[in-house]
Amino acid sequence: MRAKIISVVANNFYVHLYDLKIQIKAIPKGIFKHNSHELKPMVGDDVEVELIGNTYLITKIYERYNQLIRPKVANIDIVLIVVSIVQPDLNTLSLNKYLAFYEARNIKNVLIGLSKYDLANNHLKQKINKLILDYKKNNYAVFILTKENDILLLKEKIKSKTLCLAGNSGVGKSTLINKLDPSIQQRTQEISHFLNRGKHTTTSTKLISFANGFLVDTPGFGNLEVNLTKNEMANAFNDFANYARFCKFSNCLHIEEPECAIKKAVDEKLIVNWRYDDYLKIIKELPNDVLKIKTRAQNRKCK
């Protein structure tokens, strides 16, 4: 039977059986416990489960199409980065760090959700609308979370997918979750009871049934902190991709190198200035070729 690992609690694995639409406890086959085995079961894995006697056994792990180490989760279909326009103010540098990280980790659908748009004044809304157009030109889907039509479009986008919500506290993630699936509160209580833990004691990653798919529930997405190399960062801005291959040097970091196609594209207004400026700020943070992203840092704000 095909299943998905939804939680690991004290070396106990809980899986969702696709066909039966139930959740059961399962034990990994002994081979997965050996240090020599490449794959170790983790939350998000699609697995094969067999009932042997009275025990469900995980006998196979299907190939992952992506995975994160911190938080530890595999096979993410969509990441929705939620940022507020006011209270707190929109921070494009923080947002671009999120975007770069998930692009670098092979997550194909990274979406942007803007909350509290209705609280912005007209002057700020004009700037935000220009910002939205710039992101859309770079093939990012942007949703204004206070607009009912955008919520409907987002519901359709996430249907039957494994979704992660990223973003700092206070930006409206909880409100959004209830808008996307009003039954989530009851289901969260059911899952907490199944896993025998309180709803306020989440210390590890788990998946909750959500919008005919799954929602990643983890403490690790609120304050992203990861390591990226300079070369990874240089390749993580998707608006650079069409131009970077024309750089003179294959390892060009697009800072001061001669014959850099990215700098030329910025001069020709093919890449927007503020995105490139944010890129320079990000990559110049890199000591010894490593970037430690801290999304709570004080960075550029759109006012």
From Swiss-Prot:
Binds 1 zinc ion per subunit. The keyword RNA-binding applies. GO terms for biological process: ribosomal small subunit biogenesis. GO terms for cellular component: cytoplasm. It is found in: Cytoplasm. It is an enzyme of class 3 (hydrolase). Monomer. Associates with 30S ribosomal subunit, binds 16S rRNA. PANTHER family: SMALL RIBOSOMAL SUBUNIT BIOGENESIS GTPASE RSGA (PTHR32120), SMALL RIBOSOMAL SUBUNIT BIOGENESIS GTPASE RSGA 1, MITOCHONDRIAL-RELATED (PTHR32120:SF11). Belongs to the TRAFAC class YlqF/YawG GTPase family. RsgA subfamily. This is Small ribosomal subunit biogenesis GTPase RsgA. It comes from Ureaplasma parvum serovar 3 (strain ATCC 27815 / 27 / NCTC 11736).
